């Protein structure tokens, strides 16, 4: 018998299975099996008859439910009808939600607000599918694409990247006009402004469906930090970050999904901008406040690294480190701070804001592209396209309506009116290949200039030269010689026997562990101390102890002002009551620690650390209720950054297996070098029809432009109006949909030509749905005034906080890897062709409606799981990731997470596609190291900044012990400190860290599959 397809309210489809009718009736109404099966048979018979006579092929679950209710009424079961009634979800579905919660969104906890949200969502999503154009609804149900945030389809845009200067200048109207809440004047202090920014996040959470962020956070806050101590600044930042994480008011009780971008250096684009200060008054320019910006930068990173009150990392706001040209040249200042913290704090993100190094003087090939303004319309055109527009003659063609992007000697990027368009006769061209896969084409007679140094080099003389000069700074450090008498004193404090015997001149160690026994024996021998060694049986413990007897006169308090005595004291204390993980084990704040119930000993330990320059933190641990006879103890955590490790590895510790890994330069020197850009290859090219250039006062920029990354994966390139303020601030992504690339390939039977035809059809469906949603939200914001927070105006310009015309509308995609696996006879660069096709559709849509379209690598959380389930249901032999029931697709254009290729392969893959996903993408580098080397991260970051990758993160799993509040960058089952199994494992879901227990089935499987690299 032919199949009938059942369509669920969430859009998913499955084959009609009559047995599910009786099962659902029994589950939801409690009726007996005989009645349920009788109703099942009637309905099945009716549907198959409709199939045979009327060609019925599809039926919704709502229609089946209505038929069940009709049959129950006929049987006289009125209460059962009530139980079967559908209000967005059935009674049993709602009861299941009450009992078990939902894992569609890992950022939502199991709370009453979550229940309320999902109850509402059931109604709103069903209405959205019913109200949107039918072909858009059908495409979602079939799994060809996914409409995100359908519960807010008619009501909310997606995300927002704020310019905090708006609130610094204008104050805050929490409802947009002051009728429903108090109106705040411009803040006069750092603390008040941060509170305004927090309240703006909260208000925004009621009108956006996604994330919110503040760009250039430290740079734009810097004016408010003038005259404040670092302690005051840090306290204010600490309050802001804690409050962001304590505000569970977002869409079902979620934590505020937020981010802040912090600049390693003051952006050139802000240096000469008026600085908005206390009271909204201009006070100089932002370039005057680099020192204050650096203090805020430091405070944000330190607060993030110090974690919360129970030792867990802060989940929000996501901290985005903006890296610009020159920021990574020297390992000092902000660069050193970022990498010392970022080596082991897995919550940071990195943003490549460095300008492209494709600035050249010369004559270019016809297919070289550049940014131009023609009649004030921003275009990205090749020289050949410009030639065709101008119908230019050979030589110079005067132009009056064209501006080109240029750079001056001070590295300022500005628009310049072109004087002439130059079209030359054919001549020799060369392709210049630089490090980091950069390249350009020009003629041999011209020089090239980089943004960084502005040095002119003749093309043919550059083959073996560096464009920038490399320099090395050696900072010699003194070598410690730990005093062994002080080592004995420290070790005895922890493991020696004290009391009356000691006062009578007798000292002894009573040791069990072999490494401690060897350590004590070697210490006593090295100091030429006479001792007796005996094996003593301890009946209560049923073990043999090794006891060393010697004179208590040998235990002498060391000179606490001598650096080598302090090094010896620290060695002894760490070897007794300290704990150092094999190979540098723990994460940065827990690579080494000291525990004692004697506060005198902990004071000595901290004094030694302080004088030796080892950073530490400590906390008093109270015994639990079932440990009545236990004393409180103090745990001191050593911060094992480069400097601390350099000192610790000079200490003499018990058995070398407990020593910190020798992972830093043994010569104890800092090596800092400037970023060098070398010419790798010069390739002569065949002659072309013509070569081109513009005649302008400054050097033109060819290639791509500056990019700023905002929330989630949304990137806002400066390619809309050319204005940083308009294109990147107080704007964001309006909405996006995700295309199921593997399903489109499978529906095309693997035929490449049919695939592109089908992809074109699905893109057109996406266009119709996104435009329909845009019109709905415009009505909500501007006609119904449901989101007036967004419409509050700047007091000078009158411009609203939010302008929907500047937002991006986005085509997203999922499963490019599986798509390529499902196509036949593809070319080596088929993945690029697919994304270029999506970009061509984006341009086509822009020409159609003049709106700001983009392409994004979707942050698919539940979507990747949903798509894979649909694919396996329709094509059981299809290639997806995971195992049965826990299927998922590879995220966007990523390599599968289980791939064990080295990190370079993952970076190259991201670079390959990055320029084709200017709407946003992220590179996840999954690390398996408990403690990473900061210099290795620095070196890798320098390489990534030289590439076309714009947004990346080093993601580590970490585990938190709920018993003793211990955190470790590892996935463990038993706490190494207290032995508890009451642990919570965290890992990155998409754009934030969450407990893995909150992941959906597909994401749980992905977590298990992730191959974790070591640097």
Enumerate the predicted regions with their spans:
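Secondary-structure capping and boundary motifs in well-ordered enzyme cores
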Residues: 13, 60, 485, 561-571, ...
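Long, charge-rich boundary regions
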Residues: 977-1015
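Extended active-site and interfacial segments that coordinate phosphate-rich ligands
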Residues: 21-30, 277-298, 368, 386-387, ...
């Amino acid at each position: 018998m032919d199949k009938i397809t059942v369509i669920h309210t969430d859009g998913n489809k499955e084959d009609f299975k009559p047995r599910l009718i009786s099962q659902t009736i029994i589950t939801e109404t409690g009726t007996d099996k005989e009645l349920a099966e009788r109703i099942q048979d009637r309905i099945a018979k009716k549907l198959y008859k409709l199939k045979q006579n009327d060609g019925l092929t599809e039926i919704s679950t709502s229609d089946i439910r209505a038929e069940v209710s009709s049959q129950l009424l006929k049987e006289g079961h009125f209460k059962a009808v009530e139980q079967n009634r559908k209000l967005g979800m059935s009674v049993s579905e709602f009861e299941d939600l009450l009992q078990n919660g939902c894992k569609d969104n890992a950022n939502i906890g199991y709370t009453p607000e979550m229940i309320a949200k999902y109850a509402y969502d059931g109604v709103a999503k069903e209405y959205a599918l019913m109200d949107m154009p039918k072909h858009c609804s059908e495409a979602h149900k079939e799994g060809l694409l996914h409409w995100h945030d359908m519960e807010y389809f008619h009501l909310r845009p997606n995300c927002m990247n704020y310019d905090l200067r708006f609130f610094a200048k204008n104050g805050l109207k929490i409802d947009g006009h002051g009728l429903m809440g108090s109106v705040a004047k411009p803040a006069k202090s750092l603390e008040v402004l941060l509170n305004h920014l927090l309240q703006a996040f909260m208000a925004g959470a009621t009108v956006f469906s996604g994330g919110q962020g503040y760009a250039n956070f430290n740079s734009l806050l810097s004016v408010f930090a003038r005259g404040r101590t670092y302690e005051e600044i840090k306290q204010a930042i600490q309050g802001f970050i804690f409050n962001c994480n304590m505000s569970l008011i977002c869409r079902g009780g979620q934590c505020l999904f937020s981010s802040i971008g912090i600049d390693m250096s003051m952006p050139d684009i802000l240096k000469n901008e008026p600085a908005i200060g206390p009271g909204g008054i201009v006070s100089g320019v932002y370039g005057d406040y680099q020192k204050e910006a650096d203090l805020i930068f430091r405070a944000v990173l330190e607060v993030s690294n110090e974690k919360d009150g129970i030792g867990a990392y802060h989940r929000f706001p996501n901290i985005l480190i903006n890296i610009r040209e020159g920021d990574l040249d020297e390992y000092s200042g902000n660069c050193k701070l970022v990498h010392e913290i970022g080596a082991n704090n897995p919550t940071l993100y990195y943003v490549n804001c460095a300008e492209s190094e494709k600035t050249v003087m010369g004559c270019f090939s016809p297919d070289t592209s550049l940014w131009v303004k023609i009649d004030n319309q921003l275009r990205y055109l090749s020289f050949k396209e410009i030639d065709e527009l101008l119908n230019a003659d050979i030589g110079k063609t005067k132009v009056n309506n064209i501006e080109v992007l240029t750079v001056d000697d001070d590295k300022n990027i500005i628009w310049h009116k072109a004087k002439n368009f130059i079209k030359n006769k054919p001549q020799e061209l060369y392709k210049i290949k630089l490090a980091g896969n950069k390249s350009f084409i020009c003629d041999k007679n011209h020089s090239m200039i980089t943004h960084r140094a502005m040095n002119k080099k003749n093309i043919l003389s550059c083959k073996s030269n560096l464009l920038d000069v490399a320099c090395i700074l050696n900072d010699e450090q003194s070598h410690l010689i730990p005093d062994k008498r002080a080592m004995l004193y420290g070790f005895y404090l922890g493991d020696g026997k004290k009391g009356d015997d000691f006062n009578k001149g007798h000292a002894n160690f009573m040791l069990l562990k072999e490494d401690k026994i060897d350590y004590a024996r070697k210490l006593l021998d090295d100091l030429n101390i006479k001792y007796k060694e005996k094996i003593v049986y301890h009946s209560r413990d049923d073990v043999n102890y090794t006891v060393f007897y010697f004179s208590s006169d040998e235990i002498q308090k060391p000179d606490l002002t001598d650096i080598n005595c302090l090094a010896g004291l620290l060695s002894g204390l760490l070897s007794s009551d300290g704990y150092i993980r094999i190979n540098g084990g723990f994460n940065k704040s827990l690579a080494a620690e000291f525990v004692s119930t004697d506060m005198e000993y902990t004071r000595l330990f901290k004094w030694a650390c302080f004088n030796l320059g080892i950073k530490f933190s400590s906390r008093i641990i109270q015994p639990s209720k079932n440990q009545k006879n236990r004393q409180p103890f103090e745990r001191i955590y050593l911060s094992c950054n480069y400097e601390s490790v350099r000192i610790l590895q000079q200490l003499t510790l018990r058995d070398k297996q407990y020593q910190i890994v020798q992972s830093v330069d043994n010569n104890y020197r800092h090596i800092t070098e400037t970023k060098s850009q070398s010419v790798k290859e010069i390739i002569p090219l065949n002659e072309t029809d013509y070569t081109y250039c513009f005649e302008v006062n400054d050097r033109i920029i060819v290639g791509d432009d500056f990019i700023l990354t905002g929330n989630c994966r949304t990137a806002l390139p400066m390619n809309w109006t050319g204005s940083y303020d308009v294109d990147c601030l107080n704007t964001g992504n309006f909405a996006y949909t995700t295309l199921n690339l593997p399903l489109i390939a499978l529906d095309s039977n693997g035929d490449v030509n049919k695939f592109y035809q089908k992809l074109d059809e699905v893109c057109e469906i996406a266009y119709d749905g996104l435009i329909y949603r845009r019109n709905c939200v415009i009505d909500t914001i501007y006609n119904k005034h449901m989101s007036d927070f967004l419409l509050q105006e700047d007091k000078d310009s009158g411009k609203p906080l939010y302008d929907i015309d500047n937002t991006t509308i986005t085509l997203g995609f999922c499963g490019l890897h599986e798509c390529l696996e499902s196509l036949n006879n593809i070319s080596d660069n088929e993945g690029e062709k697919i994304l270029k096709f999506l970009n061509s559709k984006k341009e086509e849509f822009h020409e159609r409606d003049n709106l700001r379209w983009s392409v994004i690598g979707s942050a698919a959380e539940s979507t990747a799981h949903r798509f894979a389930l649909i694919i396996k249901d329709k094509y059981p032999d299809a290639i997806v990731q995971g195992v049965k029931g826990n299927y998922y697709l590879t995220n966007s254009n990523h390599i599968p997470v289980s791939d064990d290729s080295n990190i370079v392969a993952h970076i190259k893959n991201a670079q390959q596609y990055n320029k084709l996903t200017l709407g946003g993408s992220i590179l996840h580098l999954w690390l398996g190291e408990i403690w990473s080397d900061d210099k290795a991260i620095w070196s890798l970051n320098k390489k990534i900044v030289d590439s076309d990758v714009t947004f990346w993160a080093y993601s580590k799993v970490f585990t938190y012990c709920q018993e003793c509040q211990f955190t470790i960058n590892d996935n463990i089952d038993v706490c190494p400190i207290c032995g508890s199994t009451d642990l919570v494992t965290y890992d990155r879901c998409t754009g934030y860290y969450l407990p893995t227990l909150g992941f959906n089935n597909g994401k749980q499987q992905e977590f298990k599959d992730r191959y974790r690299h070591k640097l």
